[in-house]
UniProtKB/Swiss-Prot annotation:
Transmembrane segments: none annotated. Its main location: cytoplasm. The gene is RHA2A. A zinc finger (RING-type) spans 86-128. Interacts with NAC019 and NAC055. PROSITE patterns: ZF_RING_2 (PS50089). This is E3 ubiquitin-protein ligase RHA2A. The ring domain is sufficient for the interaction with ANAC. GO terms for biological process: abscisic acid-activated signaling pathway; positive regulation of abscisic acid-activated signaling pathway; protein ubiquitination; regulation of response to osmotic stress; response to salt stress. PANTHER family: RING-TYPE DOMAIN-CONTAINING PROTEIN (PTHR47662:SF1). It is found in: Cytoplasm; Nucleus. InterPro entries: Znf_RING, Znf_RING/FYVE/PHD.
Amino acid sequence: MGLQGQLSDVSSDSIPLMLLSLLAVFINHLRSFLLRLTSKSNPNLPVDDVSIASGLANIIVLADQLSLNRLFSYRCGDGGGGGSDCVVCLSKLKEGEEVRKLECRHVFHKKCLEGWLHQFNFTCPLCRSALVSDDCVSKTQRSVGRDLISCFSLH
């Protein structure tokens, strides 16, 4: 009858999308319920938005630095750095190895610098000069904080 005609109009691709949207609505309601429940049971429980925003901002800065590491790395011998030591792994930089020269002019193995960055060290491993300005990090933190507030604000 009328119901069968309507079901045949629904594409099989749209059914998973409808289920996904229903799941998203359910999760949103569950999150709202749990937030109300926890705020009633412990009103002194602080929500540390600053540390969440700071952590996410660090991840964004890390992604930017890893991207720069890929873009600005080169083979040793192409742009200098041969014969010196990588202070991260304490090995000699050999011709043909992938290296990266920082703004402070220090050269490291690309993989060693990636490992350094993965520990959220945004300074030169040798002289500790900043790879990212404090202003850039605080801008990213403010931007992430604003995005978090708009994304997770209760309606």
